[in-house]
Amino acid sequence: MAVLQVLHFPDERLRITAQPVKEVNADIQRIVDDMFDTMYEEEGIGLAATQVDIHQRIIVIDVSEERDQRLVLINPELIEKSGDTGIEEGCLSIPETRALVPRAEHVKVRALDREGKTFELEASELLAICIQHEMDHLVGKLFIDYLSPLKRQRIRQKLEKLAKQNSRAR
């Protein structure tokens, strides 16, 4: 298992639309395991394969405090959503940035699990928000896309400055 490098905005690879997984095999399972290692190392609650430069429809999530409730969504499809909610979201690909994003309060998704078996899941609250956030990544959408152009530009400038500081520190 390995910790993968997380892409950071404004890296254009974050905008690539992920392709469906054709077959859940040992390679896909290894990607899933590496994604969990990466997510836990980065102290996140969700990670889409796009964020680690793997452009396949794979999401890993664990919103539990104990970090023991792993959820794998391969080729997820949103089949129902209802209600309105929103929280200040953050993202491993957009460090040190949070913003309020409107989301559905409840969702129902269909996906494949780590073994390739189809399942459906109903989720609400934080899990529903996390699923929607990660599914956005699979189509090249970031949570800052919900913000005004001015706020997005400020975030871009802040992150470019941070990247320059980090590269000088190395």
Swiss-Prot record:
GO MF annotations in UniProt: metal ion binding; peptide deformylase activity
Origin: domain of life: Bacteria
Reaction equations catalysed: N-terminal N-formyl-L-methionyl-[peptide] + H2O = N-terminal L-methionyl-[peptide] + formate
Keywords: Hydrolase, Iron, Metal-binding, Protein biosynthesis
Pfam families, alphabetized: Pep_deformylase (PF01327)
E.C. number(s) listed in UniProt: 3.5.1.88
Organism: Pectobacterium carotovorum subsp. carotovorum (strain PC1)
HAMAP family: Pep_deformylase (MF_00163)
This protein's encoding gene: def
Top-tier EC class: hydrolase
Cofactor or coenzyme needed: Fe(2+)
Protein name per the record: Peptide deformylase
